[in-house]
Design a protein with these regions (language model features):
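Helix-loop junctions at membrane interfaces in 12-TM secondary transporters
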Residues: 22, 26, 134-147, 353-367, ...
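Helix-breaking motifs and short loop linkers at transmembrane-helix boundaries and internal kinks
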Residues: 116, 137-142, 154, 170, ...
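Helix-to-loop junctions at the C-terminal end of transmembrane segments
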Residues: 103-116, 322-336, 420-421
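Conserved MFS/SLC helix-loop-helix module at the cytosolic interface between two early adjacent transmembrane helices
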Residues: 101-141
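A membrane-interface helix-boundary motif in multi-pass transporters
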Residues: 198-210, 416-440
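C-terminal transmembrane helical hairpin of 12-TM major facilitator-type secondary transporters
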Residues: 337-381
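Cytoplasmic helix-loop-helix junction between adjacent transmembrane helices
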Residues: 141, 145-186
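Transmembrane alpha-helices of Major Facilitator/SLC transporters
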Residues: 309-333, 343, 347
Length: 456
């Protein structure tokens, strides 16, 4: 595949002439995504200690950022303890990562719509490996921050995984593929934080780099091209112009890049697609806020250590993987929306149990319900959305959805952390519980067309 003047693409023979079996594609996506998520989640239990180590070393950049965080914490009335400010600091770093992912995912999707999924995936994974190499070699906070910036810009591979599954021909294969992606997330967020909590901190970045390089080589060897030349977008420049619509929150919620593209969904289906996108955004906005504050809640209320938090994440991830394997992947096409509505309703008592519970059994019950929702909502919504748009627009559709998710994750943690320390855990989690009624209510208003997986 080559691009001439003006960004037009000249199709070349695909790397693999015969279409690969759908089960093989799903298996390759699962293993590749699992390697990527293992590398990504190794950092989660290390971040507080990593920030503190840069503070103890009197790193100049860290010191200037810490003073800015101190000012912001004082401006919104947060307690003055350093650990609270560090929490906000860590949240800002996480939000920057998600913001960069939000900015880059549409461009990655547009490129893959023209050049194919395989080149886009390899390019993204090369950037991810570079970010872990920078982290492993870093001695200063500036180098660590640069590694997070590179990683955020390169994180379009997750969006491409959903686009690859969306390329599959049958609705049942797409539904199972999205469920398998959910299983990969569950296993990644189960094993990654556990490894990061128990391994020596100096070995973690090198292990992340090993996972990333292994992922790159695995995809290079085994991933077939799933978007044939005749179904690709005519030019990269058209894709980039459409990507501008993916950088505006309002345009994202309206799926403007899809509506203006070739063979867009029309009428009721376009309205349903927009409704599903709004549900996806609201859910991840609220869920990511709870997800971010959870580790600090159990540290303060139950005095969980880094190892105990690793065990908690292991419990959550194992529960998610069990639910996805035994239930979510067996949901029949056309029944996804009903499953999502039930899962969102479960988050209401889950939030109340976690926010108000002062015993481990109550916390465990809340985490069980929380894990059920986490196992069901995103895979099912992704599976439904994958049925919208023409074949050449699958990357744009799924890129839009992932951009909405990245935008939600960019603002959700900061908003939740601010509410947590302004009003306390009980108020924060109670408000979130009530707000989960919003996406549930929107789902109830969607037309029956939103519950089908028939391709346009």
């Amino acid at each position: 595949m080559g691009c001439g003047a003006g960004g037009s693409c000249t199709p070349r023979p695909p790397i693999r002439q015969q279409p690969a079996p759908e089960t093989r594609v799903v298996a390759v996506v699962f293993l590749g995504l699992l390697l990527d998520l293992l590398a990504f989640t190794l950092l989660l239990p290390l971040l507080p200690g990593l920030l503190e180590s840069h503070g103890r070393a009197h790193d100049p950049l860290y010191g200037s950022w810490q003073r800015g965080v101190d000012w912001f914490a004082a401006a919104i009335g947060m307690p003055a303890e350093k650990r609270y400010n560090s929490v906000l600091f860590g949240g800002l770093i996480g939000s920057v990562f998600s913001l960069l992912q939000f900015l880059s995912a549409p461009l990655t999707g547009a490129v893959s719509d023209c050049l194919g999924r395989r080149p886009g995936m390899l390019l993204s994974l090369a950037g991810v490996a570079t970010s872990y190499a920078a982290w492993a070699a870093s001695k200063s906070f500036a180098a660590f921050l640069a590694s997070r910036v590179i990683g955020g810009i390169s994180k379009g591979n997750v969006s491409l995984c959903t686009a690859i599954v969306a390329d599959l021909g049958s609705p049942s294969a797409r539904s199972k593929g999205m469920a398998v992606i959910g299983v990969a997330f569950s296993l990644g967020f189960t094993l990654g934080p556990t490894l990061g909590a128990f391994l020596p901190s100096e070995t973690v970045p090198w292990l992340a780099l090993l996972f990333a390089i292994s992922d790159l080589l695995f995809i290079w060897c085994f991933l077939p091209e799933t978007l044939p030349p005749q179904k690709r977008a005519p030019s990269v420049s058209l894709g980039f112009r459409a990507a501008v619509d993916l950088l505006s929150p309002l345009a994202l919620l309206r799926f403007s890049a899809v509506a203006r593209g070739p063979d867009p969904p029309t009428g009721v289906r376009l309205g349903s697609l927009r409704g599903l996108g709004l549900v996806y955004f609201l859910y991840l906005f609220l869920f990511s806020g709870l997800e971010f504050t959870l580790s600090f809640l159990v540290h303060q209320r139950f005095q969980f250590s880094r190892v105990e938090q690793g065990k908690m994440f292991f419990f959550i991830g194992l529960t998610m993987a069990t639910i996805q394997g035994a239930y979510a992947r067996r949901i029949r096409p056309g029944r996804e929306i009903a499953a999502v509505k039930r899962a969102i309703l479960l988050l209401i008592p889950a939030s109340l149990f976690v926010g108000w519970g002062h015993t481990l059994p109550i916390l465990g019950l809340g985490l069980l319900l929380y894990s059920w929702a986490a196992a069901v909502v995103v895979p099912c919504l992704s599976s439904v959305v994958a049925g919208y748009g023409s074949p050449r627009q699958k990357g744009t559709v799924m890129g839009t959805l992932r951009s909405l998710g990245a935008l939600a994750r960019a603002v959700g943690p900061v908003v939740a952390a601010s509410a947590y320390w302004l009003a306390g855990a009980r108020v924060c989690y109670t408000v979130c519980a009530a707000l989960f009624l919003l996406p549930f209510s929107i789902l109830r208003t969607l037309s029956p067309a939103a519950q089908t997986l028939k391709a346009e």
